[in-house]
Amino acid sequence: MYKRQLLDPRTPGRVRAVLDWEMSTLGDPLTDLGLLFVYWPQAGEDRGVSVSSVTTLPGFPTRRELAERYASRTGADLAALHWYVGFAYFKFAAIVAGIVARSRAGAMAGKDTTGYAEKIDPCVELGRAALEDGVL
């Protein structure tokens, strides 16, 4: 590994992966699956928090289908997946709130954070819905 890159040991100079350690965590893999669902909008919904809409295109599985595939391949028990999704929304809301605060303090010169503050409340509501209603 060189800095944030994993290099292919069989092919010198070939980058196999680029790592972003800033948001990395150790622990339950369902934490990552929960966060993936924050970034995985489905066709016909507007959550107001997604950063991409590519998963709304034909051919992409729904979050439920993705969870079923994950469980079938890993054997993971997804009975508490809604908790991980809720946690991910709250974490995302906190991260966005931090970005907004730094922007307002002038610590993000040159970065356009227009619209970020409007994402916080929907994230909190989606987190609540995941925890209380089991919404994925």
Model-flagged regions — what are they?
Residues A76-A88:
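All-alpha amphipathic helical-bundle segments outside canonical DNA-binding/catalytic cores
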Residues T25-D28, T55-P58, D112-G115:
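Pocket-edge positions in alpha/beta enzyme catalytic cores
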Residues L6-R16, T74-A79, T113, G127, ...:
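Conserved NTP-binding catalytic cores of kinases and kinase-like/nucleotidyltransferase enzymes
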